[in-house]
Design a protein with these regions (language model features):
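ATP-dependent small-molecule kinase phosphotransfer cores
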Residues: 48-124
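NTP-dependent small-molecule kinase module
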Residues: 5, 149-241
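Hydrophobic positions on the alpha1 helix immediately C-terminal to the Walker A/P-loop
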Residues: 28
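A glycine- and Lys/Arg-enriched "phosphate-lid" helix/loop adjacent to the NTP-binding pocket
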Residues: 106-174
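P-loop (Walker A) phosphate-binding loop of NTP-binding proteins
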Residues: 20
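Hydrophobic anchor at the beta1->P-loop junction of P-loop NTPases
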Residues: 17
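Conserved lysine of the Walker
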Residues: 25
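Extreme N-terminal, non-catalytic leader segments
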Residues: 1-14
Length: 241
């Protein structure tokens, strides 16, 4: 992972955590929002889900195996792209109005990766990218990288949903081949929750030191200090990538 570098940087406003299902991004995003707030940098967690999970539940109630069987591949990708666009737009607007750091659990890159992993065409990806181009690139994007086999084990252990190993492998490749990949801060998410949280904290310390001290804290406080409370175990992801 590239180390955080101090310098003339604006105040941290948007951080995104992305990765395949089972990488732990929901756990880390929730924890990061809490950690930043405790450290005097008020932050809000935003779950930018594409709706695939609850659509899957609706499909099951209607006698279909999953959302794709209900809507078709193209229909599912359209609905997912629209719902995630709306979620991201709402999160960005909320951050702009509140002045709080927006911690994004999934962002535009997740939709691009989902399109590729589900076999979407280049033309469809181009249309989605055109729609998502409205959104600014997060100041920091953490890609939580984990072996697809380990991600599969985690998903099976939590027992709230299911993903095939083949899909997870395709999604992992999709993230790594996105043109945005060189801008990601890649984190080894195969380690414990605590180790991953500490590495994320270490990278952001440079940003927070360069961007100004904690909000509402005395000027004598250590500007880059962030206290890391012990995070809980893996929280079941709320939606697929």
């Amino acid at each position: 992972m590239r180390a955080g570098v101090t310098g003339n940087r604006p105040r941290l406003r948007t951080v995104a955590l992305i990765g395949i299902d089972g990488s732990g991004k929901t756990t880390q995003a929730r924890h990061l929002a809490q950690m930043l707030t405790v450290a005097g940098h008020p932050a809000t967690y935003h779950r930018n889900a594409g709706g695939r999970r609850w659509l899957g539940r609706a499909a099951y109630r209607l006698g279909r195996p999953d959302a794709q069987a209900l809507l078709g591949r193209t229909g599912m990708l359209v609905v997912e792209s629209v719902l995630r666009w709306l979620a991201i737009a709402s999160a960005l607007l909320g951050g702009l109005l509140s002045g709080r750091v927006a911690v994004m659990d999934r962002y535009a890159a997740c939709q691009y990766a989902s399109l590729r992993a589900h076999g979407g065409t280049q033309r469809w990806e181009g249309l989605v990218r055109a729609a998502y181009r409205l959104f600014p690139r997060p100041q920091v994007t953490f890609l939580l990288a984990v072996d697809p086999t380990e991600a599969y084990r985690r998903i099976e252990r939590r027992g709230t949903d299911h993903e095939s190993l083949g899909y997870l492998t395709a999604a992992d490749l999709a993230y790594r081949t996105l043109p945005e990949y060189p801008t990601f801060v890649v984190i080894d998410a195969g380690r414990s929750v605590q180790e991953v949280a500490r590495e994320i904290q270490g990278y952001l310390a440079g940003w927070l030191a360069a961007g100004g001290g904690p909000v509402g804290r005395p000027s004598g406080c250590d500007r880059s200090r962030m206290v890391v409370p012990a995070p809980p175990g893996l929280i079941p992801a709320q939606a697929r990538p």
